[in-house]
């Protein structure tokens, strides 16, 4: 065993000789500053989404929606079969937006942000819960959704997703 101890002592002494005179580098103590651009990008993103909601969701434009039966809408290029699948709950929403207690302005902003999120993350189906309440958001939400270019169709949600107080929204996702 003393042979191994001697070998270790020799190794340590060789190492000490090799690193003798080495000094610590001064740049090893520099602290990285956080990137300030992330805050600016977040502020720009929020303002862009707010301006998008103002651009797409007009209160003055009233699209021609079917007044009879459940609330539904489909663009001209969307098959009626897709609307049936939406009505039956074949499409399961990946994103839920609950607008209970929001003002019209907040609801517009959140709706625009949800659609932007869905397009960015390639989510094809979302559920918007507008509630029943005083019927303000219940009337306005379908009008706003019908104006947005990324909305292919929407239909009153099945009971498991909110029934009369919710809409299932089918979104178009641009191909990359």
Swiss-Prot record:
Give GO BP annotations, semicolon-separated.
rescue of stalled ribosome
Q: What is its EC number?
A: 3.1.-.-
Tell me the superkingdom of the source. Bacteria
Q: Where is the Smr domain?
A: 97-172
What is the native source organism of this protein?
Vibrio vulnificus (strain CMCP6)
Query: Which protein, by its recorded name, is this?
Result: Ribosome rescue factor SmrB
Q: Which cysteines are joined by disulfide bonds?
A: none
Q: Name one Pfam family in it.
A: Smr
Q: Would I find rRNA-binding among this entry's keywords?
A: yes
Give the record's family classification: Belongs to the SmrB family.
Q: What does this protein do?
A: Acts as a ribosome collision sensor. Detects stalled/collided disomes (pairs of ribosomes where the leading ribosome is stalled and a second ribosome has collided with it) and endonucleolytically cleaves mRNA at the 5' boundary of the stalled ribosome. Stalled/collided disomes form a new interface (primarily via the 30S subunits) that binds SmrB. Cleaved mRNA becomes available for tmRNA ligation, leading to ribosomal subunit dissociation and rescue of stalled ribosomes.
- Give the quaternary structure: Associates with collided ribosomes, but not with correctly translating polysomes.
> Can the keyword Hydrolase be found in this entry's annotation?
yes
Q: Report the GO molecular function annotations.
A: RNA endonuclease activity; rRNA binding
Q: Which PANTHER family match?
A: DNA ENDONUCLEASE SMRA-RELATED, UPF0115 PROTEIN YFCN
Keyword terms: Endonuclease, Hydrolase, Nuclease, RNA-binding, rRNA-binding
Q: Which InterPro entries match?
A: Smr_dom (IPR002625), Smr_dom_sf (IPR036063), SmrB-like (IPR022990)
Question: Which residues span the membrane?
Answer: none
